[in-house]
Amino acid sequence: MTDRVIRVLVVDDSAFMRMVLKDIIDSQPDMKVVGFAKDGLEAVEKAIELKPDVITMDIEMPNLNGIEALKLIMKKAPTRVIMVSSLTEEGAAITIEALRNGAVDFITKPHGSISLTFRQVAPELLEKIRQAMNVDPRTLLFKPKVSRLTITKPAVSGKIVVIGSSTGGPRSLDMIIPNLPKNFPAPIVVVQHMPPGFTKSLAMRLDSTSELTVKEAEDGEEVKPGFVYIAPGDFHLGLKAQNGKVFFFLDKSDKINNVRPAVDFTLDKAAEIYKSKTIAVILTGMGKDGTKGAFKVKFYGGTVIAEDKETCVVFGMPKSVIEEGYADYVLPAYKIPEKLIELV
């Protein structure tokens, strides 16, 4: 964390929204708005001219939309960008695209009277601006070329892979899921901290680039190899064994580590069923979600992989697992597919 004031550029085509955001940000002693842009073209110019620490970027704007502006900014003046998205299906899809193209994080605009409801998400926005300062913008540019791997002798492994991720997760998942072969012999469960709707867009996006079938997990669905299951937003994702098969269940119990879905919840349930055949992968993200789950996996003799700092947008969740001594392997995201193939 820095002692100096965080300089923020606010990009939004609505003059009213620009003032709401300015009021929220300027109310804090450790941050201030240093400029505004009303469209994507102006955003690129101001990013180069003002060199802000953080940019809040509206998605839907005239002349150049948020995603196009983001791509240009990451090329010309790499900066930490937080997308401000609508809670629509289209908004979710564009947000996932933005996260793949270098945005650090996003917040969702609530429905209803803008000024009142936006103030409800003010604490989240301020927290994400502060968190963004832990990110090196150069990390966001890293895009290794990875070719899809093959398995010559696929076997029924009886194993399961559970991947947990938060801030920066879509980028790291992009280096892992699309590079696994169609005959990967273990089901993969992904718990990514995201609101409802966004997890569906994430699944659709990964499915379009992967040989494995990527989908949101459904209540009562059987867990099978050949699939990557994404935990739906706002539900914990559990697993239960029944008549020799394993099924998912969705759980609305209290948040764990202040999140739902929680990685710990899914790892706990998976480890109880799959025991030593559980492989946990803890990717980029703030906080410690996944650490207790990793302990459970180790308790039953399973394997834990933590993402290396090199490819993490936020080195928090993996760092916690490494510091507790639970990580068997510490690897950059692009080397994880190879290790998973070796382990299954």
Swiss-Prot record:
* SUPFAM superfamilies with a match to the protein in the record: CheY-like (SSF52172), Methylesterase CheB, C-terminal domain (SSF52738)
Its PTM note reads:
Phosphorylated by CheA. Phosphorylation of the N-terminal regulatory domain activates the methylesterase activity.
Q: What is its main location?
A: cytoplasm
The Gene Ontology terms for molecular function here are: phosphorelay response regulator activity; protein-glutamate methylesterase activity; protein-glutamine glutaminase activity
Residue ranges annotated for the CheB-type methylesterase domain, each copy included = 154-344
Q: Among the entry's GO cellular component annotations, what is one? A: cytoplasm
Keywords for the protein's UniProt record, in alphabetical order: Chemotaxis, Cytoplasm, Hydrolase, Phosphoprotein
| Compartmental location | Cytoplasm
PROSITE patterns from the entry? CHEB (PS50122), RESPONSE_REGULATORY (PS50110)
What EC number is given for this enzyme?
A: 3.1.1.61, 3.5.1.44
Q: Which residues form the Response regulatory domain?
A: 7-124
Identify which residues the record assigns to the active site: 166, 193, 289
Q: What family does this belong to?
A: Belongs to the CheB family.
Q: What is known of its domains?
A: Contains a C-terminal catalytic domain, and an N-terminal region which modulates catalytic activity.
Stored HAMAP family: CheB_chemtxs
Q: What does this protein do?
A: Involved in chemotaxis. Part of a chemotaxis signal transduction system that modulates chemotaxis in response to various stimuli. Catalyzes the demethylation of specific methylglutamate residues introduced into the chemoreceptors (methyl-accepting chemotaxis proteins or MCP) by CheR. Also mediates the irreversible deamidation of specific glutamine residues to glutamic acid.
Its recorded name reads Protein-glutamate methylesterase/protein-glutamine glutaminase
Q: What is the primary gene name for this protein?
A: cheB
